[in-house]
């Protein structure tokens, strides 16, 4: 699937080992602290696609599929998929190649898409970097394919980050020399075959900062699909240039400021506002970035705040701003795991509860986004405009003038009072009838061109023209504009 076609998708990210088991158990033990395989499988994903599709997601991103180091080390097992050894074999803990093809087929039968996590940067070895037996790697079976051993100690030194190794002295991550023609040829051929063999629609690329940038244009091109890269860094000046070599990157610059703005009622809205402007100016196309507030590498949002209103605000942001929304499995169940490995809880232990408060919130928010896309062909590429802030509130407009979606977010939390926010600068003219899509409340733009937005309990508000909502399946409308 092309980068342009990915703009309108929404992605549910899961670690295959932690989402669903082949036996469909919802009680099988998964102690995250043990850092071992918990029994998730590709068949387990297939069996619970209704749960994912029920939130309106159109795609899933699954953890890496390659054969991993087999040992149970002091750092645990390779259940996450980032310690690969044999790139032409699939991880048998998750099933067979046919099971993976069946997952791809099951998604496509629903009109959904498959994104696979890939790791061109490194392999994985159970042992010290000085003692690696390179013959265990297929096809990179000699040290000539790799950078000489040195651990990354200074993450601000880009040369070191690219040339030295991630990992530690228990599990070393031998760093492939991606400047070598032999390495490039193998990876470019491999990624083309991966996409072809499993009908893959998109790729998430791990550890992008650790690879020389000029490796990626050939890799992205060979894949023939949308590629979004991971750069775990909050600086748009260093992240955005990677859009010259990849379709998109994960939106870490927004992630950090979104977290800081909404983790408490004293969070900085102004820093988020400034970062929205920075990303818009520094990145060549913010609509191709991957938006998230949770993943498997950072503590969950609920670890910072247990407040449901604050959680709803950050979710509304990732869906209704520029970029492709990504939700990490368990986020919809308000999981609260801290840093790695505690943020890698088994989804099945929630019983796949479709009545959970954030499950239904995500479903509604996804429907609002799909309605905006259906109603306005320019919506998805229209630059999001953060046009109002106060100490607790940010308001944004996205879409063609006259049908723009107005999103109002608050960090006040569930104890926030009820009040009317007089919102100016939305671009709507006096007398325009709007509907707030979460509460189905009618609002009319006043004679000054201001919108009287009814705020309560620190909850987000999203306003669309009444004519658009009335033609949708939201708020008891006619359903003429198809929204799942």
Curated annotation (Swiss-Prot):
Substrate binds at residues 83, 122, 204, 209-210, 234, 297, 344. Binds 2 calcium ions per subunit. Calcium is inhibitory at high concentrations. Its EC number is 3.2.1.1. Monomer. It is found in: Secreted. This is Acid alpha-amylase. Keywords: Calcium, Carbohydrate metabolism, Disulfide bond, Glycoprotein, Glycosidase, Hydrolase, Metal-binding, Secreted. GO terms for biological process: carbohydrate catabolic process. It holds the Pfam family Alpha-amylase. Belongs to the glycosyl hydrolase 13 family. Its cofactor is Ca(2+). Disulfide bonds join 30-38, 150-164, 240-283, 440-475. Glycans are attached at residues 24, 157, 197. The keyword Kinase does not apply. Ca(2+) 1 binds at residues 121, 162, 175, 210. One of its GO terms (molecular function) is calcium ion binding. GO terms for cellular component: extracellular region. The active site is at residues 206, 230. Ca(2+) 2 binds at residues 206, 230. Its main location: secreted. It catalyses: Endohydrolysis of (1->4)-alpha-D-glucosidic linkages in polysaccharides containing three or more (1->4)-alpha-linked D-glucose units. The record marks 297 as: Transition state stabilizer. It comes from the Eukaryota.
